[in-house]
Swiss-Prot record:
Gene Ontology cellular-component terms listed: membrane; viral envelope; virion membrane
Pfam family, one: Pox_G9-A16
Any GO MF annotation of the entry: DNA binding
Source organism of this protein record: Monkeypox virus
Protein name (record): Virion membrane protein OPG143
Length: 377
């Protein structure tokens, strides 16, 4: 039978990135039980926020400790703007009270709780947590008055900032479901917060024919077009007989086989300029701007009928102006006449010069000379 697990050594090491962070290295007689428990001991005086609107010192307030320990880490001038609230649960070494044990890897609240004799050395508490006074609001009625802008006289900034933060999202979600055409709801939607877009996507999936859904589609395209496409798909799937849906959800028929190209370019429900873009999927909206079609007007001056035949002649080719939406692509660049580059001209000049040089050499008359006899002794 093996020997019992015993603790051989405890070593405290200081962190590198933050001097407040430390490691308690526990060495056992069996290496597989070795642990490095990370914890913090607060030493800073806070004059800044750890996250927007709140300060969370690295201090675990255990039972029997005064709450003054928490406030001792904030400079007095800064502390006047904040209040202490009930913080998250934490664990602290009793022999180093106030230390904050980090929960990570194998070290979890359950792991500490299951340790034998853990309560003799580790205590539970709440982490110090301060929140800005401006972030507090009394009751739901006050939230309603601030978020609906009924009375903003005494509203904190976070509830009176034109919906730039998420603090009014919960209220506006319910409020706008009951009154989606309210100007404040449309203002909330124009900020393009995802809760707002999701809310209107759900509303327009039941009431796409309402005017506020036109504004909804205008706002979300092109960045968040999926919210609108989802609403249109659900609405048209539930209202297949609605003629407005015939471009997005055309009734099954063979008539479409007679035409070339996507139906968004020839179907009246798609091509009519009076059509609201909300009845088109985003890709159809883009496609319609690229459609090119030619129309003409037929005037019948005379019509000849012979037995069961009618003969009509019309010249439609005279009207060549294209009608429809302007193509959003890049403008066409006319091809320019390509002129020879300086490099090409230089090479050509050198070649011509060499040719003329050799021609001039070989065209000269031969120089007459006298033969000289040389005899070597």
């Amino acid at each position: 039978m093996g020997a019992a697990v015993t603790l051989n050594r405890i070593k405290i090491e200081t962190g590198i990135a933050d001097i407040r962070d430390k490691y308690m290295v526990l060495d056992f007689n069996y290496p597989e039980y070795n642990r490095a428990v990370r914890f913090a001991e607060e030493s800073y005086m806070y004059y800044y926020e750890t996250s927007p609107g709140e300060i969370k010192p690295k201090f675990c307030l255990i039972d029997g400790m005064s709450i003054d320990h928490c406030s001792s880490f904030i400079v007095p001038e800064f502390a006047k703007q904040y209040v202490l609230i009930h913080g998250e649960p934490c664990s602290s070494f009793k022999f180093r009270p106030g230390s904050l044990i980090y929960y990570q890897n194998e070290v979890t609240p359950e792991y500490i709780k299951d340790l034998k004799y853990a309560t003799d050395y580790i205590a539970s508490g709440q982490r110090c947590h301060f929140i800005k006074k401006d972030y507090l609001l009394g009751d739901s009625d006050s939230v309603a008055k601030c978020c609906s802008k009924t009375n903003t006289k005494h509203c904190p900034k976070i509830f009176n900032n034109n919906y730039k933060t998420e603090h009014c999202d919960d209220f506006m979600t319910g409020f706008c479901r009951n009154d989606p055409g309210n100007p404040n709801c449309l203002e909330w939607l124009r900020v393009k917060r995802k809760p707002a877009m999701s809310t209107y996507s759900d509303i327009c999936s039941k009431h796409m024919d309402a005017r506020y859904c036109s504004e909804f589609i205008r706002i979300i395209r092109p960045d968040y077009f999926t919210f609108g496409d989802t609403a249109l798909y659900v609405f048209c799937n539930d209202h297949k007989g609605n003629r407005n849906c015939w471009c997005a959800n055309y009734p099954k028929s063979n008539s479409g086989d007679k035409y070339l190209g996507p139906r968004v370019c020839w179907l009246h429900e798609c091509t009519d300029e009076s059509r609201d873009r909300k009845w088109l999927y985003y890709n159809q909206d883009v496609q319609r701007t690229r459609c090119k079609y030619v129309g003409c007007t037929i005037n019948v001056n005379s019509l000849a009928l012979k037995n069961s035949q009618a003969e009509l002649t019309s010249n439609c080719t005279r009207t060549t102006s294209a009608v429809g939406d302007v193509h959003p692509g890049e403008p066409v660049v006319n091809d320019k006449i390509k002129l020879p580059t300086w490099l090409g001209a230089s090479i050509t000049l050198v070649v011509i010069s060499v040719i003329f040089y050799f021609i001039s050499i070989y065209s000269r008359p031969k120089i007459k000379t006298n033969d000289i006899n040389v005899r070597r002794r």
